[in-house]
């Protein structure tokens, strides 16, 4: 198997922990794993209390995410779906490109689910889990979701309280799947190290 042109950093963490913010600050190319949610109406979607459980990994297409990551790693470019969370469906596609010899970030709440798949295929640079105090995550998530109009306010509050109660278990699961836990500063430092290593590789 030829060496990949680029490798992926999987950035996991609870919803609202700041993954997208940290990824943007890194300056590295970003693949949003939220774009691999399944469309509403998919018969395989999991349900909780009579509604779709969007916080279950079964609501997400892990195979498609790994396929696109491998394509980006091998070819430097990939056609990526665009998902509208407020409408629970895909609304288009976009092209993502990365430079040869670099790393790129794939971030999302289910990133840890594909650590093994990416590692087996030789495209994994690192897997990190961003963790914060649950109360901070709760406030960040609620303000973001209300601002973006992702769901009706009552739904967001109920979901937020449920995720608050389960956040520590979510982090434990992500770490058990192979993601290394760290604070925002620790994760940002590791991303800088990986970015610098990529620059050295390109200039060598």
Regions from the PLM with identified roles:
Residues 29-33, 37-91:
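Conserved nucleotide-sensing/catalytic segment adjacent to the nucleotide-binding pocket
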Residues 22:
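Hydrophobic positions on the alpha1 helix immediately C-terminal to the Walker A/P-loop
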Residues 15:
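The conserved Walker
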Residues 2-3, 99-100, 162-204:
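NTP-dependent small-molecule kinase module
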Residues 19:
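Conserved lysine of the Walker
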Residues 4-8:
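Pre-Walker A (Motif I) flank of P-loop NTPase domains
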Residues 11:
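Hydrophobic anchor at the beta1->P-loop junction of P-loop NTPases
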Residues 92-150:
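ATP-dependent NMP and nucleoside kinases share a basic, alpha-helical "lid"
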């Amino acid at each position: 198997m030829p060496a990949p042109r680029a490798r992926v950093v999987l950035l996991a963490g609870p919803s609202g922990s700041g993954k997208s913010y940290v990824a943007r600050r890194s300056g590295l190319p970003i693949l949003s794993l939220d774009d691999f949610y399944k469309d509403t109406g998919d018969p395989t979607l999991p349900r909780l209390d009579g509604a779709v459980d969007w916080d279950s990994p079964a609501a997400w297409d892990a195979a498609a995410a790994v396929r696109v990551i491998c394509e980006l790693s091998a070819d430097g470019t990939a056609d990526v779906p665009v998902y509208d969370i407020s409408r629970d469906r895909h609304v288009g596609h976009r092209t993502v490109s990365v430079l040869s010899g670099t790393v790129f970030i794939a971030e999302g709440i289910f990133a840890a689910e594909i650590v093994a798949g990416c590692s087996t295929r030789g495209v994994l640079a690192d897997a990190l889990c961003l963790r914060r105090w649950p109360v901070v995550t709760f406030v960040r998530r609620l303000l973001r979701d209300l601002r973006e109009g992702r769901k009706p306010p009552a739904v967001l509050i109920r979901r937020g309280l449920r995720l608050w109660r389960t956040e520590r278990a979510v982090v434990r699961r992500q770490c058990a799947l192979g993601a290394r836990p760290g604070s925002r500063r620790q994760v940002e430092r590791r991303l800088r190290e990986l970015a610098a290593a990529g620059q050295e590789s390109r200039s060598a």
